[in-house]
Amino acid sequence: MAGNSIGQIFRVTTFGESHGVALGCIVDGVPPGIPLTEADLQHDLDRRRPGTSRYTTQRREPDQVRILSGVFEGVTTGTSIGLIIENTDQRSQDYGAIKDVFRPGHADYTYEQKYGVRDYRGGGRSSARETAMRVAAGAIAKKYLQQKFGVQVRGYLAQIGDVVCELKDWEQVEQNPFFCPDPDKLEALDELMRALKKEGDSIGAKVSVVAENVPVGLGEPVFDRLDADLAHALMSINAVKGVEIGDGFSVVTKRGSENRDEITPEGFQSNHAGGILGGISSGQAVIAHLALKPTSSIMVPGRTINRQGEAVEMVTRGRHDPCVGIRAVPIAEAMMAIVLMDHLLRQRAQNGDVVSNVPRW
């Protein structure tokens, strides 16, 4: 009802606010016997963690995760896994000026209208700080997918503003603060970030996420199609305003003869569908792209209103990302992994004994 959970068998429920005492989540449906330590989760959390480069918010949270339950002697027990991350670097005084003012482009106005009350400190529950717990839960899913099925989920920054980053080298993604796979674009990205910082403005971005070695058969017709659930999960990430599966909106200008993924005895000849046909995984790489809006927390004055409906001009102070798309890469990976793990467990539960003589590649 409250919209704080995702998944049916592998189910993740998060709680906490940006400037609250802590963030937490409960992860249900994790199979028993999976080796799991806090270090397994910390790797991805460190990739998402704020304050790690000059291109992201300078709020410095260690994001040290603690496992509270569901793991005994280094392996999962099959019971609920409780996770918690304490907030340590809140500066709530930065937000006192907006207590009675609605920041344009943020959730302040809609939360106030929906609940009649809001935590104005850092956006409260609407803050992207909440996604730390998604990344922690996603790390569990990523480990299970990799160990049990050889599925690898990876993401990268595909575009910031007018700077397009081609997928040239996966290894480059972890070698720079932008998660950029194209080393030739790093200088342009750096120049863009410096210009935005000087102007006090922000910029949008495109993030791509790819899952390889996904088994064929994942997805439930008709409302729980794999692509529908992926779109739901990825659209739930803060600032995401669009999701594409495979070639996405570019199919508008294509003919059917060029867009269809033809099949030969050697396998599929293309992957315009992004690894999903009829809402069910085809065994090809599952590919999704996300469009993220530029953050509205900027130093450029903007018009808004206060609680009394009076016109106000404001500047959003605090520590903010000039491009939220940079830190969205591990978040997108986590959400794709969560959906894939849930569908793998659902497929195993219903169709685990199904045998098909049709070739698989």
Swiss-Prot record:
Compositionally biased intervals (Basic and acidic residues): 40-49
Which one Pfam family would you cite for this protein? Chorismate_synt
User: How many and how are cofactors bound here?
Assistant: Reduced FMN (FMNH(2)).
Leading EC class = lyase
A single GO BP term for this record reads: aromatic amino acid family biosynthetic process
PROSITE patterns documented for this protein: CHORISMATE_SYNTHASE_1, CHORISMATE_SYNTHASE_2, CHORISMATE_SYNTHASE_3
Function according to Swiss-Prot or TrEMBL: This reaction introduces a second double bond into the aromatic ring system.
Single GO term (MF)? chorismate synthase activity
| Subunit record text | Homotetramer.
Q: What is this protein called?
A: Chorismate synthase
Q: Which reaction does it catalyse?
A: 5-O-(1-carboxyvinyl)-3-phosphoshikimate = chorismate + phosphate
What EC number(s) does the entry state?
Answer: 4.2.3.5
This entry carries the following GO cellular component terms, namely:
cytosol
Residues binding NADP(+):
48, 54
Keywords, ordered alphabetically: Amino-acid biosynthesis, Aromatic amino acid biosynthesis, FAD, Flavoprotein, FMN, Lyase, NADP
The annotated region (Disordered) lies at 37-59
Question: Pathway involvement?
Answer: Metabolic intermediate biosynthesis; chorismate biosynthesis; chorismate from D-erythrose 4-phosphate and phosphoenolpyruvate: step 7/7
What residues bind FMN, as annotated? 125-127, 238-239, 278, 293-297, 319
